[in-house]
Amino acid sequence: MMVLKVCLLLVFLAGVTTARMDLNHLIGSNHHDSSDEPSESSEPCCDICVCTASIPPICQCTDVRLNSCHSACKSCMCTRSMPGKCRCLDTTDYCYKSCKSSGEDDD
């Protein structure tokens, strides 16, 4: 009976570790250091956009933002951490303009 409990504990820990590793992929270093200001989080823009070679293309923004997705996002997924790290799961047939081009004018 003790062996069964130890095996179940090991399976549980392996599952938790795997889930945490997937979360680390989501909250990697490619995120915007944005604040809670609505103007910044609501502007639809994307720095890392991936598209298929199909016609029409299927594009998805892989940027990770803090606390919220832009206002045009219909399916936003966030971590439960503080601050939350969010990624828009929408697919479109185009890429939004780059976020970096709008933020670099503040130098």
UniProtKB/Swiss-Prot annotation:
Gene3D superfamilies found in the cross-reference section: Cysteine Protease (Bromelain) Inhibitor, subunit H
Lineage, highest ranks first: Eukaryota, Viridiplantae, Streptophyta, Embryophyta, Tracheophyta
Gene behind the chain: BBI
Site entry (Reactive bond for trypsin), positions: 80-81
Family classification: Belongs to the Bowman-Birk serine protease inhibitor family.
UniProt-recorded name of the protein: Bowman-Birk type proteinase inhibitor 2
Post-translational modification: The N-terminus of Bowman-Birk type proteinase inhibitor 2 long is blocked.
Organism (species): Phaseolus vulgaris (Kidney bean)
Keyword Disulfide bond: yes
Record-marked site positions (Reactive bond for elastase): 53-54
Domain of life of the organism encoding this protein: Eukaryota
